[in-house]
């Protein structure tokens, strides 16, 4: 079939990109076919299950280069076109159309050391970035080798190219043998921050994992895209960890992936991982992060050895073909049976509620504190309240892999909670011992406890927080603050759990709770309670800040650098003097020598904090640097001023394109709206100068301006003012979902203040004190390096006791101690089962009488 097409500029199909080199615009042709844009490039049956072999021939100038999925096998002159040649590429294996890659450019290649991999590995960049391709060329082949060993399946192609594209829509695209990246997701140099370098290695690992999950075995249709993206997200932590073990990425999974999607999947607007109907082009946090979290949970209860062998079976059986989720569950279940892992039901039935319905369970644990201590464990769907009604299926119940422990030097107890809403659990703990469920937060659910258990946990954290694993410390904080925020537990409980933070030195627990603490800081900022809040937060942050210090050292561990970023932001927010003085000194030196190099990890912070703690001279310097360099860093820093006259001037400059570029006005206004001083002034500016704004900027910015103001507003008068603003300009702001969402945020803030402001204020007057004494810091920090053995899957006996969906549950509690470091998922489970005595009706009555949770 003959056809003719053109290179488009829409970043889809086979398209034209460009960049500037030495003042000259250079062009290249590249591709992005996912999900359904191969049809834009060439005639085809553009569906993932309609796989084919592709023989690609690309024409180019002799001085240019071309690349595709497969190695080049020949070059011939183009007849009648002197100076042009055809490049012939080897035929691909059978693959989906969306994986086809084509590129013609003046790029240069940086080859990897052949000793790192049996596969030819190159990084393709524009010439000026070649020196910055070394990191990718070093870690890429090592990650590929790791995955070959991990899966037990060889990479089937002869080469792998990683190409840095100047204009690229997604972050990266897993074309088989020719992965395309945004430049910032592949390039590492002396100006790359620690967090950006981590992102680079994770994205490389993510895309290389796709060479098996997505490319070798492809989902049958887009409604199962999580089979591609969930696995790639989960496995990126393994691949990246194999080359950067000091990043402790398996710990970071909890805060970077799991806890984030726990929020997304608790909204009314969420959707299942698998759609019953055909829905293409769904690439969001559910497919990626919930998919990864559910896969991680499955690996945990199967055991990592069984899980890996099952993946080998899945990849081998479905190679060069397509799969649906049942294919995955069936092969994993087959492997579980071979390995002696007995499941309480078919794996497909166990996993169906997790993949085919929305939300997840809240596990509520209520202990009896009587001899033969036990607990009533209930499950209920966790959905954040909204004013738009609830459309979820209330009858969903989950098979829940429960894990719990009272001593993190022992293997945790493991048990299955059946598809019942209540289960009686026999605990090994005595009444004066805490119990923590969801060990290492391996399960995709939240946990709430009775008040007595919370108090014992809080005491343990203060006495020696290292006796509780790092992921569980993060889980306790995250779950408690989310539950308190929606009035499931008292804020006193959540705040009690923060008391130990003055001893916490690990990045992950702090990162887990800082966003929630920031919300409290915003809500209380203009309230009488803010003085006590600031005193309390200073008592927590100061030791953390002193531990990491202001100055960066070449010997700093990766997580120390990330911790310092958080500690500095809070230290200067709280006006801790050492931080403020260091900022002023560094900013003054920068004003004296504008080309002075600042650490990339601290540069943006110093610019922002320098303006925040400065006066007019510091702001004027930032403004002049913005004008001279078009720097977003200086632009954002300008919005941090605490001088009202400067805020007023900056708002006025937004209306003059010679002062603030038109494309930057949204950044200026939204960041001013996040400024405690700027929020009120920005709102007044919007109300008073609406017509001037419309004349200067048009109407396209108003919805963004309106929404950005809402997050800090928490008074009924403010809500009424915003409603009036919407109604006065209904032709622009009316019928906007974004505007209504903003008004909903204000209502939520008002309700939160009504429910919690006074309670938190009372707590802050005299923060409760746990009776246990902290260990010495040296002991505490040593304990944090002792990790909990990961959960082992066991066979559980489940006996139905009534028609009210209550069951008794027995569990296996191996008592072997271990001091080995925690692994991402467990080894093959033991077969021992300990049958516990039946729990009596007296037990049930005692549990039901202890209800700390708000109805």
Each predicted region: which residue ranges?
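Hydrophobic helix-coil surface modules that form long, contiguous segments used
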Residues: 31-36, 43-205, 234, 427-429, ...
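C-terminal GPI-anchoring signal of eukaryotic secretory precursors
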Residues: 809-839
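Hydrophobic alpha-helical and helix-loop surface patches within well-folded domains
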Residues: 89, 120-388, 519, 526-539, ...
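Glycine/proline-rich low-complexity spacer/linker segments in large multi-domain proteins
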Residues: 3-55, 105, 110-113, 442-462, ...
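Cleavable C-terminal sorting propeptides in eukaryotic secreted/cell-surface proteins
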Residues: 830-855
């Amino acid at each position: 079939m003959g056809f003719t097409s053109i290179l488009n500029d829409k970043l889809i199909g086979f398209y034209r990109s460009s960049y500037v080199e030495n003042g000259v615009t250079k062009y290249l042709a590249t591709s992005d076919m996912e999900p359904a844009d191969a049809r834009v490039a060439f005639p085809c049956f553009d569906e993932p299950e309609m796989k084919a072999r592709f023989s690609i021939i690309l024409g180019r100038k002799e001085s240019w280069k071309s690349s595709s999925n497969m190695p080049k096998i020949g070059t011939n002159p183009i007849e009648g076109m002197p100076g042009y040649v055809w490049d012939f590429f080897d035929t691909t294996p059978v693959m989906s159309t969306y994986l086809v890659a084509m590129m013609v450019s003046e790029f240069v290649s940086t080859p990897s050391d052949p000793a790192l991999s049996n596969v030819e590995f190159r990084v393709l960049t524009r010439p000026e970035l070649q020196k910055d391709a070394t990191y990718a060329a070093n870690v890429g082949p090592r990650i590929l080798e790791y995955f070959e060993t991990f899966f037990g399946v060889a990479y089937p192609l002869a080469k792998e190219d990683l190409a840095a594209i100047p204009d690229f829509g997604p972050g990266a695209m897993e074309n088989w043998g020719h992965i395309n990246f945004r430049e910032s997701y592949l390039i590492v140099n002396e100006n790359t921050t620690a967090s950006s370098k981590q992102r680079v290695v994770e994205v490389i690992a993510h895309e290389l994992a796709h060479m098996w999950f997505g490319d070798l075995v492809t989902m049958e249709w887009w409604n199962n895209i999580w089979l591609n993206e969930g696995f790639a997200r989960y496995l990126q932590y393994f691949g990246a960890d194999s080359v950067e073990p000091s990043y402790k990425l398996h710990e970071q999974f909890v805060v970077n992936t799991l806890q984030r999607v726990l929020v997304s999947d608790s909204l009314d607007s969420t959707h299942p991982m698998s759609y019953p109907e055909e829905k293409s082009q769904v690439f969001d946090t559910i497919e990626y992060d919930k998919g990864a979290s559910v896969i991680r949970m499955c690996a945990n209860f199967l055991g990592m050895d069984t899980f890996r062998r099952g993946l080998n079976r899945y990849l081998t059986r479905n190679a060069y073909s397509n799969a649906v989720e049942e294919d995955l569950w069936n092969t994993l279940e087959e492997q579980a049976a071979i390995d002696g892992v007995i499941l309480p039901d078919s794996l497909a039935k166990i996993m169906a509620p997790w993949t085919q319905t929305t939300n997840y369970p809240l596990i509520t644990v209520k202990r009896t504190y009587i001899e033969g201590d036990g607990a009533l464990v209930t499950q209920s769907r966790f959905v954040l309240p909204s004013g738009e009604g609830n459309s979820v299926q209330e009858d969903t119940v989950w098979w829940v892999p429960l894990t719990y422990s009272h001593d993190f030097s022992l293997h945790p107890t493991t048990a299955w909670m059946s598809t019942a809403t209540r289960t009686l659990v026999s605990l090994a703990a005595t009444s004066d011992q805490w119990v923590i469920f969801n060990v290492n937060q391996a399960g995709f659910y939240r946990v709430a406890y009775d008040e007595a258990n919370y108090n014992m946990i809080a005491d343990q954290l203060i006495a020696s927080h290292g006796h509780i694993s790092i992921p569980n410390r993060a889980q306790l904080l995250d779950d408690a603050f989310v539950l308190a925020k929606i009035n499931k537990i008292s804020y006193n409980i959540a705040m009690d759990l923060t008391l130990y933070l003055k001893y916490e030195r690990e990045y992950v627990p702090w990162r887990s709770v800082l966003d929630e603490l920031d919300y409290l800081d915003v809500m209380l900022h203009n309230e009488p309670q803010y003085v006590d809040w600031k005193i309390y937060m200073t008592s927590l942050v100061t030791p953390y800040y002193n531990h990491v210090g202001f100055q960066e050292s070449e010997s700093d561990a990766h997580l120390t650098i990330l911790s310092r970023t958080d500690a500095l932001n809070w230290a200067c927010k709280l006006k801790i003097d050492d931080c403020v003085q260091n900022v002023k000194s560094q900013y003054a030196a920068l004003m004296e020598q504008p080309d002075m190099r600042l650490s990339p990890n601290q540069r943006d912070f110093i610019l922002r904090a320098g303006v925040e703690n400065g006066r007019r001279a510091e702001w004027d310097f930032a403004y002049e640097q913005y004008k001279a360099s078009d720097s977003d860093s200086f632009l954002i820093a300008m919005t941090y001023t605490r001088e009202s006259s400067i805020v007023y001037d900056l708002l006025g400059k937004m209306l003059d394109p010679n002062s603030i570029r038109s494309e930057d006005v949204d950044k200026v206004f939204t960041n001013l709206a996040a400024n405690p001083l700027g929020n009120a002034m920005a709102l007044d500016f919007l109300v008073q100068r609406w017509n001037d704004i419309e004349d200067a900027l048009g109407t396209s910015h108003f919805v963004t301006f309106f929404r950005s103001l809402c997050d800090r507003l928490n008074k009924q008068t403010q809500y009424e003012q915003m409603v009036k603003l919407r109604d006065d300009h209904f032709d622009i702001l009316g019928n906007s979902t974004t505007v209504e969402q903003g008004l909903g945020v204000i209502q939520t803030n008002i309700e939160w203040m009504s429910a919690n402001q006074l309670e938190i204020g009372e707590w802050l007057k005299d923060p409760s004190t746990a009776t246990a004494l902290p260990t010495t810091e040296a002991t505490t920090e040593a304990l944090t390096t002792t990790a909990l053995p990961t959960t082992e899957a066991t066979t559980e006996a489940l006996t139905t006791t009534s028609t009210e969906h209550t069951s008794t549950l027995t569990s296996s509690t191996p008592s072997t101690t271990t001091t080995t470091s925690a692994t991402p998922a467990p080894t093959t489970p033991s077969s021992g089962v300990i049958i516990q005595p039946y729990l009596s009706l007296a037990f049930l009555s005692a549990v039901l009488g202890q209800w700390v949770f708000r109805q």
